Amino acid sequence: MYTFKRYLTKTKDTLIRQFKAANAKKLIKIKYPILAVMGFFVLLIVFVLRDYFLKLGIGHSTSTGFITINVITNSGVGFSLFNQNPAVPYLLQSLLTIIFLITFIFSKNKALIVLLPLITFGGLANVIDRSVPVTLSNGTVETNSVLDYFQFFRSSAIFNFADICIVTGFALIFLTFVVDIFLDLKKKNKKTVSTTNKQLHGWKSIPLEERSKWNDWADHKCVFCNQQMMINSNEVICSNEECAYIDLINIAKPISVEKQENCLICNSEMIKKVDDKQASFLACSRFNEKCYYTKSCKQIENNA
């Protein structure tokens, strides 16, 4: 029970931090105007097209080559899916709108800020469209259906502008994530090669005349050899010439300590040496990725 409560508290704190980060003053001046403008234009285009094609009449069909205009009503969701059960489209499109609106609120990613409104308002447009009755040519009023009119080929599914917004949003988000993953891997590989070579040499690589610029980093000892850490501007290094701490990161497993400690700089889990039963010194688990935050025994005792 205690573990579950701790998990809920941690989740709550994470959500609060994410919300604050995604709604900082500078960011909300950009993201919510984007949401409003894109929402306005998506809804405007959807219902201008709906009105235009309704005037052409249900059943109207013309072909311009690649694009065929085929005006029909659709009781399903995008591309005529689930058209046998009227409850499913309402549920799916409403959930889609709510989920992606919440995702937008908690997002600070620039690509998502631009693309999520396409999906959100595409889904909302279909929900509104479905709630507006359509009068057929024979005078029959049809409810719980959207108006579809675009078709690539005679044999393909028929869709509307809201469907285009949803599919385009999903496709571009997927493409963005693929590109980000590729760039992150490339950057990480490049960074690992460059920083590892630099750190392996450590204090040895700093000329004697340059060492005077480095000062003791008060109360910070190397988590691996317990020697004094040195600091110069925003760079930190172990003063032990024989300390190859970058190699030892492999034996420093993320071991939770009492009142689990997180790095104050990057919020990653703090680690200790496997044989350090007293947790004399802790270091950020990203110690080999240029996050040099450490915590001495003295600091731990003060926080207890």
Swiss-Prot record:
It is an enzyme of class 3 (hydrolase). It catalyses: Release of signal peptides from bacterial membrane prolipoproteins. Hydrolyzes -Xaa-Yaa-Zaa-|-(S,diacylglyceryl)Cys-, in which Xaa is hydrophobic (preferably Leu), and Yaa (Ala or Ser) and Zaa (Gly or Ala) have small, neutral side chains. It is a multi-pass membrane protein. The active site is at residues 148, 163. The chain crosses the membrane at residues 28-48, 86-106, 112-132, 163-183. Keywords: Aspartyl protease, Cell membrane, Hydrolase, Membrane, Protease, Transmembrane, Transmembrane helix. Its EC number is 3.4.23.36. GO terms for molecular function: aspartic-type endopeptidase activity. GO terms for biological process: proteolysis. GO terms for cellular component: plasma membrane. Pathway: Protein modification; lipoprotein biosynthesis (signal peptide cleavage). InterPro entries: Peptidase_A8. It is found in: Cell membrane. Belongs to the peptidase A8 family. This protein specifically catalyzes the removal of signal peptides from prolipoproteins. HAMAP family: LspA (MF_00161). This is Lipoprotein signal peptidase. The gene is lspA.
